[in-house]
A protein has these predicted regions:
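N-terminal beta-strand motif that seeds the catalytic metal site of vicinal oxygen chelate
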Residues: 1-18, 45, 61-63, 114-119
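Short glycine/proline-centered loop/turn elements that form peptide/ligand docking sites
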Residues: 16, 33-37, 90, 117-118
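Conserved active-site tyrosine of GNAT-family acetyltransferases
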Residues: 17-22, 77, 105
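Short secondary-structure junctions
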Residues: 26-31, 84-88
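Conserved short beta-strand elements that form part of the metal-binding/catalytic scaffold
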Residues: 28-61, 107-113
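Short beta-strand micro-motifs in enzyme catalytic cores
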Residues: 37, 61-63, 94-98
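Mid-chain, well-packed structural core segment of small domains
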Residues: 63-81
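Vicinal oxygen chelate
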Residues: 74, 80-119
Length: 119
């Protein structure tokens, strides 16, 4: 395996979600079609898929996006309309994680982890 490449969130309104994620992550999509929107976030792909019917948002699989300032990133997501899922919490050493729900109910994880370095 080569490592994680893409995290996909299903949304009911692709246009509004594209606008929201553009503001939330500070990047514009590199691929924008009615069937898929893709963002390059620090070399990893965040994808948006339009919901094709009933979708259940579960908490059993999480992706955490790396940040340098967990509280600032958390506050920014909340100010853009995300809702609290788990407040920033120290999980050992200097590692801090938090999760929010986007306006479509998807769980977004953020992590400050100075011990993990990209290759």
């Amino acid at each position: 395996m080569l490592g994680l490449r893409t995290t996909i969130y299903k949304v009911s309104d692709l246009g509004k979600a594209t606008e929201w994620y553009t503001r939330a992550f500070g990047v514009k999509p590199y691929f924008n079609e009615p069937f898929y929107v893709g963002f390059n976030v620090g070399g990893y792909e965040l994808g948006l898929l339009p919901e094709g019917g009933e979708t259940t948002s579960a908490d059993n699989v999480l992706s955490y996006w790396g940040v340098t300032d967990i509280q600032k990133s958390y506050d920014t997501l909340i100010s853009l309309g995300a809702t609290e899922h788990e407040k920033p919490t120290n999980v050992g050493g200097e590692i801090v994680t938090a999760t929010v729900r986007d306006p479509w109910g998807n769980v977004i994880g953020i992590i400050f982890n100075p011990e993990f370095k990209l290759p």
